[in-house]
Amino acid sequence: MPWRRRRNRVSALEGGREEEAPPEAAAVPPALLTSPQQTEAAAERILLRGIFEIGRDSCDVVLSERALRWRPIQPERPAGDSKYDLLCKEEFIELKDIFSVKLKRRCSVKQQRSGTLLGITLFICLKKEQNKLKNSTLDLINLSEDHCDIWFRQFKKILAGFPNRPKSLKILLNPQSHKKEATQVYYEKVEPLLKLAGIKTDVTIMEYEGHALSLLKECELQGFDGGHRKPLFAIHWSVQRLFTGMQTLEPSVVCVGGDGSASEVAHALLLRAQKNAGMETDRILTPVRAQLPLGLIPAGSTNVLAHSLHGVPHVITATLHIIMGHVQLVDVCTFSTAGKLLRFGFSAMFGFGGRTLALAEKYRWMSPNQRRDFAVVKALAKLKAEDCEISFLPFNSSDDVQERRAQGSPKSDCNDQWQMIQGQFLNVSIMAIPCLCSVAPRGLAPNTRLNNGSMALIIARNTSRPEFIKHLKRYASVKNQFNFPFVETYTVEEVKVHPRNNTGGYNPEEEEDETASENCFPWNVDGDLMEVASEVHIRLHPRLISLYGGSMEEMIPK
């Protein structure tokens, strides 16, 4: 039966290991199928040509600079035989989709590394439905040691020539994430793929809130000079410093956890970048871009950032994006008050969203889902509008403004027109990313992109409790959640939220379980509680951090 024909395109880049492939590796993945690009193939320079058994067919295999192509070797048949022509159709995989190569051997129980050579196994990244990626294998069977050695070395050389894929990763793992399942997720699903790709790893367990911040702000990552360090890595990076230069000294950073962990690590990397640039971290108008790319493995009870980045909260997909070196530049916000930086972040909610999180934090002994549901119900029962003054700078997409922003000009110093609204607001959301999640499959801000240089300002004015609940329920449906008379949306570059309540937050004497400290207002910033007593100024900074992942169409060209 002929294979199903489909072309799988996944952008990629990088390296592998010389370990042997397991003998049970799959023969031919059904997704590696035929391509009609004969003219392109003819134009490519051929590196190697040989005969391998693929599936059950002996094939003429050609390795070019861009792809591996094969065609079954068949006896001559009369021209025009459609079944014969179909069987002899050329198939291919692009080299950029390969992330590892191994020698395939048949080993007995007592044998560890030696055994009868069977051929070569290629490990490939394929695109599935709904933004998912999967790893697959292709076996090239040939019993000749010399023949396989030549091909194996050529594949290794090709993989080593992909510079954007990480060679070493600093793993920050939050063992408390999602019912303490993050550790199991990493060691059972993530680490085997990283080892297969030949990526060195160093794992640090995040033992307390703020651990990642203190670690990444101070440590020298290239030496892994902290807890759980491996001395050989320091030698490895010292050698790289001599022969490859500073740009390859530091490994990429990967966070295994939920939104709280991911936001903390991103904040730490950005603070580290400002410190390295000699900037005053308390007052930052034009922050510099983080030097180290960040990978996010979704392993928390909420994975909004990873879900928005990858389009799906899928561990294997996130891991393969890291291995293949798929990088996205993502917009980041700064949150400041009275001119002092509070933190970097991607999204924030004030009002109902902030109070709900503050309530949930008081019941951490509950399971994450129970805590969230309980907090939502209680916040709805005590629904209260905040008297606010909101100023914002509308997004200007003109070329001259974008050029000025790219050069680092503070937007507040430009001759732009601020707008102001005031009144009673149930909720205020400011989001630089779509904020996809299980309760909002289309996103809390579905019209926002990861790096379009703007934020979504979503305001819910005071209304009845039933109407506000209808608005919340719309997030889980396909209907427009903003199609209510009390909901307003704006596309902005900067926002200032100034609460005008004199009491500030909740009155401690009014209820025993107040949701904020006295004279402070609760903010939900990337799932973390931030309590502020005065005006908060949110600025957007385009493409400030590099994250592994993103849709195929939005990835940075290699």
From Swiss-Prot:
GO molecular function terms attached to this record: lipid kinase activity; sphingolipid binding
PTM (free text): Phosphorylated on serine residues.
Domain DAGKc: 164-339
PROSITE patterns, alphabetized: DAGK
Source organism of this protein record: Homo sapiens
Keyword Magnesium: no
Cellular component per GO, a single term: photoreceptor inner segment
Tissue expression notes: Isoform 1 and isoform 2 are expressed in adult retina, liver and pancreas as well as in fetal brain, lung and kidney. Isoform 3 is expressed in adult retina as well as in fetal lung and liver. Isoform 4 is expressed in adult retina, lung and kidney as well as in fetal lung and liver. Moderately expressed in retina, kidney, lung, testis, trachea, and pancreas. Weakly expressed in brain, placenta and liver.
Keywords, comma-separated and alphabetical: Cytoplasm, Disease variant, Endoplasmic reticulum, Golgi apparatus, Nucleus, Phosphoprotein, Retinitis pigmentosa
GO biological process, one term: sphingolipid biosynthetic process
Residue window of motif Nuclear localization signal 2: 102-106
Chief location category: cytoplasm
Pathology linked to this chain's protein: Retinitis pigmentosa 26: A retinal dystrophy belonging to the group of pigmentary retinopathies. Retinitis pigmentosa is characterized by retinal pigment deposits visible on fundus examination and primary loss of rod photoreceptor cells followed by secondary loss of cone photoreceptors. Patients typically have night vision blindness and loss of midperipheral visual field. As their condition progresses, they lose their far peripheral visual field and eventually central vision as well.
Annotated function: Has no detectable ceramide-kinase activity. Overexpression of CERKL protects cells from apoptosis in oxidative stress conditions.
Motif annotated as Nuclear localization signal 1, chain positions: 2-9
Location in the cell: Cytoplasm; Nucleus, Nucleolus
Protein name per the record: Ceramide kinase-like protein
Region (Disordered) residue spans: 1-36
Name of one Pfam family that matches: CERK_C
Claim: Endoplasmic reticulum is one of the keywords in the record: yes
